[in-house]
Amino acid sequence: GKNIVGVVLQCNNYTVIDLGVMVPAEKILNAAKEHDADIIGLSGLITPSLDEMVNFAVEMEREGLEIPLLIGGATTSRAHTAVKISPRRSGPVVWVKDASRSVPVAAALLDDRQRPALLEATEADYAALRERHAQKNERPMVPLEKARANRTPIEWEGYTPPVPAQGLGVREF
């Protein structure tokens, strides 16, 4: 994942500072400041990475770092980025589907003419995803009496449960 993105970006004349895996947020932020980074990219291969990405976005906001944050990797998604990561910071957060799309996204983010359109489209997409997510979780509660009136009718009168067979072997009821 991240290694492929690094190679693809480097082949397109971008300088990539690869800090490795499981790097603390503080180290990434310090490196971004030290190298005057234009973009920070995070890759998530395992599920716990998703929470770390949210924490990292919070730290970027706390530090006042406004540069774009690219999100990618096997466990990531547009929906997770829109619902969990993007709202945690005021700067741009862009989910990139795969390594081949990292170059056009990076190019657009660094081009003053393309950047506004990309960010506007991304934010509109994220807003729609957040709205859909919110609606999905808003299910009206059915009153207890209505739920009881709608129960499955089962006639228990006269029902005799089967008696378990005695002994070993396969049995049929």
Predicted features by range, described:
Residues D98-F173:
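Active-site loops and adjacent core secondary-structure elements that bind or stabilize anionic groups
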